Amino acid sequence: MIPVIIGIVVVVVIVCAIAGIYNNMVTKRNRIDNAWQNIDTQLQRRNDLIPNLVETVKGYAKHEQDTLAAVVNARNAAVSATTPEAKMEADNVLTDALRQLFAVAEAYPDLKANTNFMQLQATLEDTENKVSYARQSYNDCVLSYNNAIQTFPAVIFAGIFQFKERQGFEAAEAARQAPTVKF
């Protein structure tokens, strides 16, 4: 009788341990999905601001059609991207295009003094800060999840339960390079 009870207790402990490992991996995966939704929300907010910014700049920078077209095209690509990987890539392209647009705006003092432009620029900067924070949160969640599924004993069950490694959000190549300062 005692060996049966010990056997039942051992089985219950093993099942509870596996359930705990599984629940931990599910929780971490769900945190990644939630963090991605936070990024997506901020990217959508930024995408909604861009048409107003482009219209404001058009009136002042008539000779900068290539830059404006690059921003519009990058925004359209970002809006139409469907997978997280495609959105990450499109976001990097859009961030670079916006950086170029604001560099062009420096050459137009009247544009820089325009109240609407200043408000849009401030709102975009605020949104960029929120996107940056959301990316950091996402990457933290991805790191925690990847560590969880790659360490023992969870690594044994991660494959069985189809938990796959996730990729973090990487900065665009242009963002990695230090800006050139000339005096």
Where are these regions (language model features)?
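A helix-centric hydrophobic-segment signal that preferentially recognizes long
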Residues: 1-183
